[in-house]
Amino acid sequence: AQPDQKLTLEFAALRLINVEDMGVSPGGAGAATSGSDVRGVGLVGSIESHLGNATKVKDKKALRNIGPSVTYRLRDASGQAREFQNYMVPVELDGQRVFLAGLRDTPAEPFHYLRIPADESDRIDGWLRLRQALVDPALREKAVMRYATAATPADRPEMAEQLQLTTRRAIGLFAGVEATGLNSQPGPAGLQALGEFVEKNVPAEDRERISQVLLRILNGSLFELLNLSREQAGLARLPLGATTEAFMTQAVLSLSDSFLYPAPVLFELADFKHVQASVFQVAHAQGKTLVYLSAVVLIIGVFQS
């Protein structure tokens, strides 16, 4: 959807209980792949490995209620609608807590899910700040300079300028503002854009090595961008460590997937009030005394038999 496209919001359903099979088959074909190290992600690989079903078929079932969800439709001016299903609380997949934002084009299709990592407060806010910072040219440039300064070896200061250029190109490709070839216009974004750039500009024998270098640079610059967004929100920098690395790995994957998300907005179920009502029908029955008396006689007869 285009940002200026007029869409109509249609509420479809609120489900309080969603029981899903959360079983894990280690190393099996059904295991979720979104928690893998981004440095090992094939740049030309299919997006389906990340933007997929919330749960896959696994060898061992583990049914679990993963909380409330809201379903809604966004309908365009031509009457075409897409259906979305967003969960209220994060779900743990492969040891990573993620928010599931589902979508499908028709009711006959299964939902496919964008997996957004939860921040240290178990909220979606950290990822949203990073997503907004990614489309801000000024913040991207600050992140480039910070990363290049930190990554330049102290004994090789002459590398600083080249590292700045490479970092600027990597994060620009990821943000969709850099062309992937000499004679092309900016087009794809995310990991797909880096993949196209490598295919068009790097000899086949060097592609794997260059891909790894670009991904390390991208990860580092996005980490600086994340901390810049936290500074703007009055938050401290995220410390380096396994938890931060896991968040950044999933953040990079979901940022890449988000460029394929077909809507300019994502609605979050923040709170709701569940009101249950029971209705009892009270009717006046003729001859009720006779009915009650017959019931008493019947009960006495049962105990005396």
Predicted regions and their residues:
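Solvent-exposed, non-transmembrane regions of integral membrane proteins
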Residues: 1-305
